[in-house]
Amino acid sequence: MAEYPQLLHTVLDTTRPRELAEFYRQLLGLRYRTGDEPPAPGVPDDADWLVLEDSLGVRKLAFQLVDQLPRTTWPKHEVPMQLHLDFTVSSPAELHRQRERAEALGAELVLDRSADPDEPLFVLADPSGHPFCLFVQ
């Protein structure tokens, strides 16, 4: 049987790695990789690369510092969306609950298709502007 490369994690560019990592940590219930935890109060945070793992220690997302990050204008095409993340929830009620959680954590609503009978979903943008979808599966 042939071996294939395995996906380690998805890396998101950001001008604020800690802020974006914290957003996804809280949204998805992840934890920091050992050594990537926030510094003690009063200690500068100079992190330029952070990794989040699940409860089993499997890497899920990484955050890489960049100097600039033009925010996507999707659905307009001036600054295209080059990647987006899809997250599923179990019911329409959970879809609305998770949208509210995401917005409370700093996400912005981009598109509301929650009334779509075939595939209810929300498209939101994280604090760095990366689009992500919440939909019922």
Regions found by a protein language model. Give the residues of each.
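Short beta->alpha transition motifs characteristic of CBS
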Residues: 134-137
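Short loop/turn microsegments at loop-to-beta-strand junctions
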Residues: 8, 48, 119-121
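Vicinal oxygen chelate
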Residues: 17-18, 56, 70, 78-128
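Short, solvent-exposed beta-alpha or beta-beta edge segments that form flexible loop/patches at the rim
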Residues: 61-71
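Core segments of cupin and vicinal oxygen chelate
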Residues: 2-4, 13-61, 104, 112-115
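Structural preference for beta-strand elements that scaffold enzyme active sites
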Residues: 9, 60-62, 84
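Short, flexible turn/loop "capping" segments at secondary-structure junctions
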Residues: 1-4, 77-79
